């Protein structure tokens, strides 16, 4: 259940019944059992908090340690259920089953970037028999640009891959009339261009 904090208060009543009894019964006596069910709530609770004047401020930031992020978020989550919602019993039922995800750091960012590039390479090969080659020097250009700002997480990295690689590659293939059966090597990423562009070389492959 995505962004549970935006749910109507009545939704919490239903989940409280599930968490307490392990089942949910409607007005006609129909019962659904949750004994073999995993329920996952996701939330941005604690990212921002309100001061005494009701102004919204960022509570955690990228430069904090994971321990500090965890402490601040758990405190803010507790305040939300106890003070703002007035429903501490919900938090009591959840107990310690709260997983705090850290901000994406460079190591994780590199893994996400590599996975997205590899996925594109596989898709081009499978669908169009196009071999996309990105030498280490070119890949480093992409990495430096795509991972320069990690505050938007994995989605931000995906947006950068689309802007710096996928869209320029699509334009290059279209302008070059390349449809399939070729090897495209990215010589350089022109990340400062508007829109971003690629310098590529292409070798046509003979059909076998």
Question: What is the predicted function of each stretch?
Answer:
Residues 1-208:
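AAA+ P-loop NTPase nucleotide-binding core of proteostasis motors
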